[in-house]
Amino acid sequence: GAVPAAQFSPRL
């Protein structure tokens, strides 16, 4: 996707 996952709250 064009939006990096870092923008959201990573739940790893």
UniProtKB/Swiss-Prot annotation:
Keyword Secreted annotated: yes
Localization of this protein: Secreted
One term under GO cellular component: extracellular region
Chain positions with Leucine amide modification: 12
Family: Belongs to the pyrokinin family.
Function recorded in the entry: Mediates visceral muscle contractile activity (myotropic activity).
Name used for this protein in its record: Locustamyotropin-1
UniProt source species: Locusta migratoria (Migratory locust)
Lineage: Eukaryota, Metazoa, Ecdysozoa, Arthropoda, Hexapoda
